């Protein structure tokens, strides 16, 4: 797909995620990409596993199988984890579970960790893994407001049972760190790394044909 934005890619890019939100971010940045997902279920956290360690492991589990199918591409996968007091909160199993999760988050500070796994062309065995952590404070809403939010259906597929980019924005009173990270992709960190590796370049930069140099996709 060809889209307009501040960046373009010097090699094929494959997003190993079916998340519409992650796709929207790359699309808005102008990075052409295709989508291919691993198809397997996400790994479960190990008892006592830290949120950062789990997010990084899960991101790689989603990315590596796809990278093996696209050796000539840069393959990017991601995972987002919500943790309260160091305990990982997954996606709600139903309305009652969502209410329990939102009650726990209401009036408290929690962390959102998004990790990215990047497999450079021809180098799927040595992925680059990065992550970002954002602190989020949720307003102490009463059960009536929480139940009304759950009734919208939005929490069903969201880590922590809320989506800051949608209706769930009203739940959050403050964040410290990257907003895109809470949505599901640490965009600044990801683009910085991709530009450093030569995978993406600013759209206004000279093309390889103009300056006589081939793109440098560094491992």
From Swiss-Prot:
Q: Does the keyword Transferase apply?
A: no
GO molecular function per UniProt: dTTP diphosphatase activity; UTP diphosphatase activity
Instruction: Show the Gene3D superfamilies listed in the entry.
Output: 3.90.950.10
Q: Which reaction does it catalyse?
A: dTTP + H2O = dTMP + diphosphate + H(+); UTP + H2O = UMP + diphosphate + H(+)
**HAMAP family according to UniProt:** Maf
Family the entry assigns: Belongs to the Maf family. YhdE subfamily.
Record-given protein name = dTTP/UTP pyrophosphatase
Q: Which organism is it from?
A: Oleidesulfovibrio alaskensis (strain ATCC BAA-1058 / DSM 17464 / G20) (Desulfovibrio alaskensis)
Write the lineage as a comma-separated list.
Answer: Bacteria, Pseudomonadati, Thermodesulfobacteriota, Desulfovibrionia, Desulfovibrionales
């Amino acid at each position: 797909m060809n889209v307009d934005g501040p960046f373009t890619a010097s090699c094929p890019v494959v997003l190993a995620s079916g998340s519409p939100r992650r796709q929207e971010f790359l699309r808005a940045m102008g990075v052409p990409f295709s989508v291919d997902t691993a198809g397997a279920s996400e790994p479960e956290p190990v008892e006592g596993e830290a949120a950062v360690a789990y997010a990084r492991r899960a991101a790689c589990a989603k990315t590596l199988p796809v990278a093996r199918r696209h050796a000539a591409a840069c393959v990017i996968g991601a995972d987002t984890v919500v943790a309260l007091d160091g305990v990982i909160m997954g996606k709600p199993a139903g309305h009652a579970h969502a209410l329990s999760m939102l009650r726990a988050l209401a009036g408290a500070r929690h962390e959102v960790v998004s990790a990215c796994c990047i497999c450079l062309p021809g180098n799927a065995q040595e992925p680059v893994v990065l992550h970002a952590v954002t602190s989020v404070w949720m307003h102490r809403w009463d059960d009536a407001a929480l139940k009304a939010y759950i009734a919208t259906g939005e929490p069903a597929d969201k880590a922590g049972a809320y989506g800051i980019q949608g209706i769930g924005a009203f739940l959050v009173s403050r964040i410290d760190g990257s907003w895109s990270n809470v949505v599901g992709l640490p965009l600044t960190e990801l683009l910085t790394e991709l530009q450093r590796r030569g995978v993406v370049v600013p759209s206004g930069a000279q093309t390889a044909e103009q300056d006589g140099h081939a793109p440098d996709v560094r491992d």
